[in-house]
Amino acid sequence: MKKNFLRKMFCSLVLAATVLTANAADRLLIVGEAVWGGWSIDNSIVMLNSTENPDVFKATVNLNANGTFKFLTTTDWGNLEYRAGDNDVTLTADVASNLVSTEENSNDKQFKVSETANYDIVCDLTAKTIVVKKAGYQTSPLKHTALWMIGSATPGGWSIGEGTMLVPTVDNPTVFKATVNLVEGEMKIAVNNQTGFGQTFYLRDTTDETKMVFGGDDNKWNITKAGKYDVTVDVVNMTISITETNSSGISSAESASNVSTALYDLGGNRVSSKNLRPGCYIQKSGSKIKKIIVK
C-alpha cells in the first residue's frame, strides 16, 4: 500500500514538473535602454514563440550597445523575469549564455551587446539559455517583430490581444503585410499585442492617408467598404497601402460548407493542420481569424 502511494505521488510530481517545464512562460517581452521602447512595458518588444517549441522565443530587432536589456514574462513589474545573474553579461555571437530567472537570483543584472546592430535573439526557457547573432538584414534598425491591426473595421475589434497580425517580409523586415477581411469602420496599428492602449500606435497622417505618423493624435484610417484587403505597412518610409483584393468568388454569406479554413505560423507561412508541433498559430476561417496554441 505504501509503495503504491509513493509511486503515485512520484508520478504526480513528475507530471507537475513536466507541465511547468512545458509552460515556462506564455510570453516574453524585451525591455531596457538597448531597445527602442526603453523601460516602457507598453512599448516592450514582443518575442514570438517558435512553432517547434513553445518554450523557445525568437526576435530579430536592433540592440544598442550603449544600453542593457532583460526579459519580462508579464505586463507588470515584480513578477517572473529572466536576467543575466550575478553580473551584467556582454553577449557573444552564437555563444549560449545563461538565462537566469528571478526565482533563482534576485540580482537585477542584465544583458548587453558590444556593437549596435540588428540581432537574431533566441531564448530557450527549458535550457535557460540566450543566444544572439547579427541578423542578415542591417539596412535599417528593426524595431518590431510584428505589428497588429485593431479597430472596429478589423476581425478582433478594439481588443488588442485579438489584433490581426502584420508579418515582416523576408527581403525587407521593415515592411509588414497581411491579407484580411475588413468591414466598415476604423483601424490603427499596434506595436504590441500583449499590452494596452498606453503603447505608441502607428496612426493616419492627416495630410495624406497613405502616410503614417508614430504616436500623436489618435487619427485612424476609415474603411468605407467591407471586403478582403491587402495591407502593407512600411515603417521606414512611413507609408501604408490598403488595397481591396480581387473577388475570390466566395459569397459574403458564408456557410459551414463553403468556408475556406487556413492555418499559418507566426512567420506568415501556411501550414498543415495535421501533426502540428507545439506553438502558436493563426487560423483564418472565412472572415474570422483566431489564435490557436498547441501544447
Regions found by a protein language model. Give the residues of each.
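Aromatic-rich carbohydrate-binding modules that target alpha-glucans
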Residues: A25-A65, T74-S97, S140-E184, N192-D217
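Short, aromatic- and glycine-rich surface loops/edge beta-strands on solvent-exposed regions
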Residues: F69-F71, I189, G279-S285
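Bacterial N-terminal signal peptides that target proteins for export
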Residues: K2-L13
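A glycine-anchored, Pro-Gly-centered beta-turn/N-cap motif
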Residues: A65-G67, E115-A117, V183-G185, K225-G227, ...
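A recurrent domain-boundary module in secreted/ectodomain proteins
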Residues: L125-S140, D230-G249
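Append "Rare intracellular matches occur via the same short Y/T/C beta-strand/loop motifs
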Residues: Y119-I121, Y229-T232, P278-S287
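C-terminal outer-membrane/trafficking sorting elements
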Residues: S247-K295
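Hydrophobic h-region of N-terminal signal peptides that target proteins for export
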Residues: L13-A22
